[in-house]
Amino acid sequence: MFAVNLKICIFLSLVSFLLQCKNTLANVTFEQKVQTNLSHDKNGDIVYGHREFKGGIYAFLGYDNCTIEVNKTVNGIDWNEKKDVKVSGNNNIAVVYSIFTSEEKMILIFKCDNKFYITKYGKEFKWSDPKVIDVSNVIGTNTTPAVYSGSLLSMNNDFEKYILVCENHSQNYINVVDQEYMREIRLLGKCMLSFDEGNNWKNEVMNLYSDEGYTKINTLRLSDYGGKILVKGTNAQNLNQTIRSIILLCSNLHDWKLFCGLPTIRFRKDISVENLTYLNTYHLAIVKNEDKLQLAFTYDLFETFDPQYLNTEFNGVSHYFVLAPDEMVYLFYHGNEKKNYVIKIKTVPRKIGCELNTNDTVNKIYTYTYKYIYNNKLSAKTCKVPSSHLKYSSDGLYKLFEVRLPKDIKVTENCFRYSFLSDLNNKYHTTIIKTRVINKLEDYVEVQFHFPIYYTKFLYNYKSTYCVLSNNYRIVVEFDYIRNHIDLDFPFDTDTVKLYSNESVTHAFRNNTEKTHVHKFPKGTYMTSYFSYEKEYVISNYIEEPFSTTFTILTQTQMNVHFMAGGQKYKYEGIDLTDSSPNYELSLNSLSDSQNVDIFVSKFDNNKTIGFVCPVKSSYDGLNCFDNVYIKNKTLVKIEYLFGENDIFVVPQRRIYKTEGTAMESLLYLNNNNVKKLIDDKSIIHFYCECNVNNNVIKVNYYISPFYDENSIKQEINKKDQEITMINKTIPQDEKDILFNNEKVVPLSNEPQEIIQPPIQEKLNTTDPSKAYIYGANIIFIAIISIISLSISSFI
């Protein structure tokens, strides 16, 4: 009897313990402040790396003799390991400018005796010899650094990484005339950029501007904030008023001018924000309320900030949030009497995605919810997710997020179907984010959405796509990196602007007529239109030579535009039947008298982009490529089924701007996984597209295989039908998967595919496609407890 009672007692204790774990699973908690043993006998700041590196947290202190003292801690309190970075033969004080941290290395940029140096710390755990870098364009003898500490930054997409070094050039507007003070934008700083980790630096200086009212900012600190640059200014002045701090977010870039403004996150008017960061799926902030500093955070990452407060108050300056190991964030700050403190914050990671709550409970499992969105007939309830906050798949090829839905709520067929053309019927749109069910329980299902990171090269920033649920709620994904964008109707100080490759240009007009709005653009410029009074142009990725043109803007004045030569050609395997893109080797001029063209795609690296340009206005004119393609007997099939998998992605058809006529481009992208599968299958994919050129139907055959070379493919083609075994061998035989109506495009079904195996191992959100893994700790923990329980039971 005693044994039975003991078993029951152990069981109840375990249940109670597990329930407690469940209730505190996503609660943000903290430890009381502790003084660290890190000290600095100079007046300069201690600069911390923004995240741990190889299990350690690093602090950087500038000293005499051109020395940077690098301290390391594991627990945030005891700084026991110290290394020096030093330039010999110099007695001046070293000043830290930038610290970049990735999975593989730390990059330190510092200044001494008006020279800039760069040094790197990698897997050998030693600093490289400091190397002088030429950033003389940004040097100012009387200016102070705008210190950056963070990840490698992303511009326009996930692939374009850069580092920067900046000087504080915020001007003193106190003794200037009113007209100068009322200027719309004010200079914050000047930065130099490198896209190869400091080996080469761009000649152009990137200016930071703000449209917020201030007269001077004494100290600028920069950090990454979900793909953008966050500016933290302290000891700011606005005429005769002193402002303790100012927080700005930079997102618009043009002509190497980066424009910063107040973030969309808002606090109450009686609260001032001293610091703000985004770490480990939380917004974290230090706020000042009635002369008291408090720690605040939010569970919901949507645009509104409804903060929760941690029950701690403190005084100090130079606050640094640092992402530490074991799901912790350390807050370091400088207190009174030159003492340094740390507050440890437990931030349990959540799933990136949306939680459809049926009551007013706080979302602690997912990063977004529908709770704060006002629901009315004009605006459906929406959960908005920025692409820069999404996590990567374990192979680094996809962006992922999850949505938890009650079992009676379904994903509809028009989920995440998108088009660059506002006038196109949605049945011709392209499914750009695909779904699969990863967890199916009695009361709810979890649906995972995924799309390739390559999309961020094509789905331009601040463009969004949405999914409608069966209850009319919406999930919105915004592609939101720092972008190269200019609005020609924005009030400029000049009537002349420069435009560069890949820039997005908005132009509004009073009368939407084709004749009055014909302009000369570089070859390969795309055009979109979301409103009847406005057009947007995405300048070609490659401008062969410079030229000029003029635009009539809304004020009916002339804007002179100079297109600057430069950029990079992309290589698309396919053909341009309009000769309107710089990215194709084959064009209309390459055609012989034959109306059939064979494209052999057999030379592969790790990926491949396949393209087709046809002189039509839209899919209405019969352009079936690449969402649906033709196979033999003019049979129309879905591209996913042709490749035998659901990880094939098509870029929505885009309209290429032409002064005469029109052209549409469709792109099919094959990533590493797709290529590997084709190699393993030893198969050849064949399909064709048709295009009407000057009343002649041209048939373009695509033969795709990374396993066979072009000669082998031709040999297979020349065989008799019954002998051909390698071509399209993965096409399903089910009739419902093959469409015979070649007069219209049938939309792809987007009903979530149920995945039988467990969820794939995924990485946490980061701007680098590499970080710690989620291993399903709860399941492992329960398994361990179960084993212990069974062991005790056996013992008894």
From Swiss-Prot:
Residues 571-720 form the 6-Cys domain. GO terms for cellular component: cell surface; plasma membrane; side of membrane. Its main location: other. Glycans are attached at residues 27, 37, 65, 71, 168, 240, 275, 359, 502, 511, 607, 633, 728, 765. One of its GO terms (biological process) is symbiont-mediated suppression of host complement activation by recruitment of complement control protein. Keywords: Cell membrane, Disulfide bond, Glycoprotein, GPI-anchor, Lipoprotein, Malaria, Membrane, Signal. This is Merozoite surface protein P92. It comes from Plasmodium falciparum (isolate 3D7). The gene is PF92.
